[in-house]
């Protein structure tokens, strides 16, 4: 049902009662999911332009200039609500939707990333959601031949009842082949191609704009789309061939709000109208009505603008790939969205009003009185036991059980595989891209502004340890109910933090999506604010890339950046039962300089190993690097007055661990930013010495801790 206030606005504009079909169009296109009515004022604060940005926000995906005539398409989407109701299909179609966004820009998809957020795996329900979502992503991505090269998986009890499935997709094409969703000329035909239209996903856009109820699994299952990756692969090849042959004037994939959304947005973007003949749509089910035909979100469908003389050629291509296709309307000079069904006009709406008339507003915001939970833990009597507890946490442990289900080498571009700070793909003989994703939800819950800044800095450092400078950022802004002033305050401040940090690094925010109403009636919880981002950067492949693990005995270990005692939102506090207590470590003012110095050190070719320090702090970072060999570290001189657990587990941003056989030369490159040589690589254990403590952890103990998630899943 349309909100009463919206209905009043619509009646006034139309001068009459809207028809049932018109109400459906407004219900979906004016939903939070489609119109960003609560978030639009905040999204305008991002810097979205830059020297490499060809197309920024507003199209199906952004287009970023690379080199040698190549451009990158990048987009990010969420499929959160559907993945709770039907986890396999919800996750699978989340992949399919963002992949079609890339295709509709004329680019071939070359990489996926999947930041995922779950409740702890100690309940059958959370375990089921986790397993099925991973299977859904793997089942779809593997079948269409697009590698998943990086990801993040984070567990927290607040995601019980509302897991988050965010997907980043990257594509590649020549600049002259770039396509847009901006309609070109009145009189051109609209062709719907791909799968036939059924009733699956009906009302998906409006479904994604409300909280999840206790009965959601049963009641909302029809709102979840069902995907077919083999059809998606055919749609991909057919679309790219049609674009390559010059038949397509503009193009848009069918996602939220189905044909009604895609065809109206395509026409409106070019200042034109559209006349749709709903009967002409290839239908999967008999006796579908106009409402269902227009708004069903059946997957694997595209709408093309085609000149009349090219219609037969496009339909021949559709037939060649054994797909469904038909002319379902045309573009008009009159800027109206008109729908005919069985000889009658069932909708006739000013198109700009439909696609851009939803009232937007910045909602009331108010800082929560109590943001902290629990209290700071005492310094542990058994430091090694605490250390091992952190290493064994599912948030710190290896995610090999997940990424081994993905084909991460298909297309033969993968240079750095999953399991390191960022994935790396080869684009040309000399250049590649690094990709990273994620955020720190617990820190953002305590301090949304700092949490937003930290997300940018951490991902930038993930790229930096591979020598990559950031080119572009996309985001999925996952929050609770924006009508709650405290939630909107979180949202507003996290967005401001993201934007400020991105500007400090001169990286434009070129696209993404907003997912609100992530709350669960079943668990009486809202998700922690989760401003998940994807970041890509350019890598020089002529210089050997450092490993994320210790690689050469005798290398000097260098700590870059400054460690501070603030521990708010840390994995250590969570493992010690402290909840979200304490102050979140601030992003240092010299973070851009630190990141730049690390990039220069990597580009020098003098590093054998490099790793970002984030979740779990220096302790977890060192342990992670001890995959093949150990190291001896002495921090007694640099820990200052910090307690041992503070120094080991602080998650202060803008830090990295480097290993080199040429410490003097690397230190010269790091001149001007905080750094210190803290030890050497070698041996069969990690040894850490401080003022008042010594730790000895064998490689076997580290391996067992890192395999905790894999062992848990393999035990069934």
UniProtKB/Swiss-Prot annotation:
Detail which positions bind ATP: 36, 475, 512
Q: Which family does it belong to?
A: Belongs to the FGAMS family.
Q: What does this protein do?
A: Part of the phosphoribosylformylglycinamidine synthase complex involved in the purines biosynthetic pathway. Catalyzes the ATP-dependent conversion of formylglycinamide ribonucleotide (FGAR) and glutamine to yield formylglycinamidine ribonucleotide (FGAM) and glutamate. The FGAM synthase complex is composed of three subunits. PurQ produces an ammonia molecule by converting glutamine to glutamate. PurL transfers the ammonia molecule to FGAR to form FGAM in an ATP-dependent manner.
UniProt: Mg(2+) 2 binding residues:
101, 253
The record's subunit annotation is: Monomer. Part of the FGAM synthase complex composed of 1 PurL, 1 PurQ and 2 PurS subunits.
BP-aspect Gene Ontology terms: 'de novo' IMP biosynthetic process
Reaction catalysis annotation: N(2)-formyl-N(1)-(5-phospho-beta-D-ribosyl)glycinamide + L-glutamine + ATP + H2O = 2-formamido-N(1)-(5-O-phospho-beta-D-ribosyl)acetamidine + L-glutamate + ADP + phosphate + H(+)
Major location (coarse): cytoplasm
Q: Which InterPro entries match?
A: PRibForGlyAmidine_synth_PurL (IPR010074), PurL_linker (IPR041609), PurM-like_C_dom (IPR010918), PurM-like_C_sf (IPR036676), PurM-like_N (IPR016188), PurM-like_N_sf (IPR036921)
Q: Name one GO cellular component term.
A: cytoplasm
Q: What is its EC number?
A: 6.3.5.3
Q: Which domain of life is it from?
A: Archaea
Q: Which UniProt keywords are given for this protein, alphabetically ordered? A: ATP-binding, Cytoplasm, Ligase, Magnesium, Metal-binding, Nucleotide-binding, Purine biosynthesis
Provide any one GO MF term from the record. Answer: phosphoribosylformylglycinamidine synthase activity
Provenance organism: Methanosarcina mazei (strain ATCC BAA-159 / DSM 3647 / Goe1 / Go1 / JCM 11833 / OCM 88) (Methanosarcina frisia)
Q: What is this protein called?
A: Phosphoribosylformylglycinamidine synthase subunit PurL
Which subcellular locations apply to this protein?
Answer: Cytoplasm
Residues involved in substrate binding: 78-81, 100, 225, 297-299, 515
Active site per UniProt: 33, 79 (proton acceptor)
The protein's annotated pathway: Purine metabolism; IMP biosynthesis via de novo pathway; 5-amino-1-(5-phospho-D-ribosyl)imidazole from N(2)-formyl-N(1)-(5-phospho-D-ribosyl)glycinamide: step 1/2
Any idea which positions bind Mg(2+) 1? Answer: 77, 513
